Curated annotation (Swiss-Prot):
Subunit structure, interactors included: The complex is composed of two ATP-binding proteins (UgpC), two transmembrane proteins (UgpA and UgpE) and a solute-binding protein (UgpB).
Protein name (Swiss-Prot/TrEMBL): sn-glycerol-3-phosphate import ATP-binding protein UgpC
Organism this protein belongs to: Shigella boydii serotype 4 (strain Sb227)
Gene Ontology MF annotations: ABC-type glycerol-3-phosphate transporter activity; ATP binding; ATP hydrolysis activity
Domain of life: Bacteria
EC number(s) recorded for this UniProt protein: 7.6.2.10
Species classification: Bacteria, Pseudomonadati, Pseudomonadota, Gammaproteobacteria, Enterobacterales
Residues that span the membrane, as ranges: none
NCBIfam families named among the record's database cross-references: PRK11650.1
Family, per entry: Belongs to the ABC transporter superfamily. sn-glycerol-3-phosphate importer (TC 3.A.1.1.3) family.
Biological processes per GO annotation: carbohydrate transport; glycerophosphodiester transmembrane transport
Length: 356
């Protein structure tokens, strides 16, 4: 096992525009880090740089305290699992898992032992003689992971490995990946555009946008204290409500562009008069009453999800989503009186988009 360090790493295709801005990341020995972000944010490019498949423009990459920036991929001590399984169709499961070790010149006995152990871990024991065409999608992905495991790498690199699986199988494979990491404790860097994968698998999440690491933290930290408007809007389903307005002159209320005033939990006097964006998650808005000082919202539509419901409405031109209990099913056009939990409000600078 080994740690991984990226030190002010950048990437430019033309020598002018940086698609990866200077990025530093320390991954502890045995840690599971997930890079998440929209398509084109640079997460797969960064993973390929760690793998040695893309050249680093500036900066350094270290694995197990060894600088590997210019080192060939085969010499870095990494194993990669891709979105496409990349299995040899004419080989059996056993042969696919053993092939990489065979071309490296490892002895037959040692290869057999490693394949047997990986097959046991991944519950592939009874499938070793089958061809890929005889396997399900989940089984093929386990074979791809087994091929990586037998190499006993310093670092696992996962490039959206579950993207080709259906929704039910993705849930199963997420659980299997969690169990696999708990057992192997190998340093892992995982790329996905799926925030559910990121939040369920990661010990720490790196949220990327436009080649920049917007925030690095535990799933709880990223969810509860988003560092920027982008993180607030990207993490969470449904997304955080983001309302534009200004802090009043006394710093006690947030005045929405539509004229509604929302109470603030003190400490915002230094932002008095400034344009800001206020964020609150749908589950932190609760039903209240006019007598209790609730803020009215005329409901447009209701999404019935089973375990709970989502009420959609507007304050002026600004959309608001409220998560309601299963038994709460107001009709369209009805007025909801709402209370926003003041200790769950998030304020973001109107110019920079950064959390204040």
């Amino acid at each position: 096992m080994a740690g991984l360090k990226l030190q002010a790493v950048t990437k430019s295709w033309d020598g002018k525009t940086q698609v990866i801005k200077p990025l530093t990341l320390d991954v502890a020995d045995g840690e599971f880090i997930v890079m998440v972000g929209p398509s084109g944010c640079g997460k797969s490019t960064l993973l390929r740089m760690v793998a040695g498949l893309e050249r680093v423009t500036e900066g350094d990459i270290w694995i197990n305290d060894q600088r590997v920036t210019e080192m060939e991929p085969k010499d870095r001590g990494i194993a990669m699992v891709f979105q496409n399984y990349a299995l040899y169709p004419h080989m059996s499961v056993e042969e696919n898992m053993a092939w990489g070790l065979k071309i490296r010149g490892m002895g037959k006995q040692q290869i057999a032992e490693r394949v047997k152990e990986a097959a046991r871990i991944l519950e592939l024991d009874g499938l070793l003689k089958r061809r890929p065409r005889e396997l399900s999608g989940g089984q093929r992905q386990r074979v791809a992971m087994g091929r990586a495991i037998v190499r006993d790498p310093a670092v696992f690199l996962f490039d959206e490995p579950l993207s080709n699986l259906d929704a039910k199988l993705r849930v199963q494979m997420r659980l299997e990946l969690q169990q696999l990491h708990r057992r192997l404790k190998t340093t892992s860097l995982y790329v996905t555009h799926d925030q559910v994968e990121a939040m369920t698998l990661a010990q720490r999440v790196m949220v990327m946008n436009g080649g920049v690491a917007e925030q690095i933290g535990t799933p709880v930290e990223v969810y509860e204290k988003p560092a920027s408007l982008f993180v607030a809007s990207f993490i969470g389903s449904p997304a955080m409500n983001l309302l534009t307005g200004r802090v009043n002159n006394e710093g006690t209320h947030f005045e929405l562009d539509g004229g509604i005033e929302l109470p603030l939990n003190g400490g915002y006097r230094q932002y008095a008069g400034r344009k800001m964006t206020l964020g609150i998650r749908p589950e932190h808005i609760v039903l209240s009453s006019q007598a209790e000082g609730g803020v009215p919202l005329v409901m447009d539509t209701l999404e019935i999800l089973g375990a709970d419901n989502l009420a959609h409405g507007r304050w002026g031109e600004q959309k608001l989503v409220v998560r309601l209990a299963h038994q709460e099913r107001p009709t369209a056009g009805s007025t909801l009186w709402l209370h926003l939990a003041e200790n769950q409000l998030h304020l973001f600078d109107g110019e920079t988009g950064q959390r204040v």
